[in-house]
């Protein structure tokens, strides 16, 4: 205390050796906060903590020696109050900490006992050496506080580990309880399934007994009728007919598991009605063919009479050569039939006669069909001689005969051809739709593999200016699956030039392979051959002058006659094509086009294979 002689008088506490600057602080400390001398390690920390703030307060006035004491009375009191308040809070906090730590001191592992003992033993020697030194007591208080903080952190870690272990145990217990609940749920479901299986087994036994009873009854009309309806022999039907489609529908229904007697009975009734209609239709055709055969002798007699009259007229004029008018009259008389004939019995069509040359001998041409009534046969040409590059009359135009299609896919039910003209590789925008044709089985003849369809349509193209850039463009559209259920889908196309470089019609029987889409009318024949073919589909048509349309109308259309058609040659090689046909001698001139009557009565679109004739289509023009 002698070292503080220059400082204001400090009042020590007689119990805990703490010093104060005023008697009020000392009295308050003695009454409320004094805890006496530290007798154990637990109370030493509290006593040291109490002495922390007074030491700081005692050190502060050392920096202000020589300052009068009277002016510092009011600030000293405020500082003392704040220091007292902080000291009180710290003491209370330390006391509560000690009370909370006492139950856990005995549970701390022995691992920590050594450091605690050593750490507690260290500050006793300086305290015993300098009990009254404030700096030593402050340092001891700091060490004790740091040690307590470390101990509390260790205890908190131990508590945290123990809490985690308890959490794991709780989770294990919860999982065990959840597994038991799931096991109970599974057992309940198994019991329910076993009960359901028992009920199902009972129902099956009852059903089996009922089936055995029904099988045991010999004269059960219901079962016999159902078996008869289900397993009755299927009526045979020609492919491509309505009865065949109904039969396919019945087979598909049975294949999919259908066993309804009512539905099967209706299908069977529809098949019977369709077969009856097909039979009636075939009988009607045979009757019509028989009537036509009966009229044939009458027509032949009328033709012979006309030929005799022509011969008499020739004899009245003398042996002079016949003129162009007589030749035209003779051609008309031989071409115009006087009734409907069966197409296979008609004579082969002939081309219009050509005028004779002066001094030209009359040789007998092979292949002509005449009655040999004194008439020279060189005036009539066979059909093959007519088809080839020929002079063209723009006023009369040309005619296109669409005969049939071969190599169609099996999934196509109906087909339709859309035609149009193109000039200089650009479509004119006018298209014509041919009547839809039913796909039929292939004929027993060589040709493309696949079904066929008979088009049997003709289309006049009047007043068409000749040009090598004019071409015919055809697009094939098909129906698949159920017919007429949706719009047809385009599948292929083809293009054909109508004139050569000399502006002659490329008349002939042409066989055109259909090409894959997209459609491009600007392609030449060489470029068109580079496009892949659409399967094996091919179009068979005839291109003739308008003056030859009447003859070609009488030609029969048979899908088996593929050998009569040829592939179109390049435009530059038309001379070789022309050389393959029989051409007249020098001096022959193509006769002027004769006035043709409209052939509106030629329409015959019988279904099935066999001879057909072309039907009319509206004319095409630019």
From Swiss-Prot:
Domain of life: Eukaryota
Annotated Pro residues bias: 344-356
Chain segments annotated as coiled-coil in the UniProt record: 81-102, 146-207, 294-320
InterPro entries, A to Z: CCDC17
Region (Disordered): 334-356, 584-622
Keywords: Coiled coil
Record field: compositional bias (Basic and acidic residues): 593-615
UniProt entry tagged with the keyword Coiled coil: yes
UniProt protein name: Coiled-coil domain-containing protein 17
Organism per entry: Homo sapiens
Lineage: Eukaryota, Metazoa, Chordata, Craniata, Vertebrata
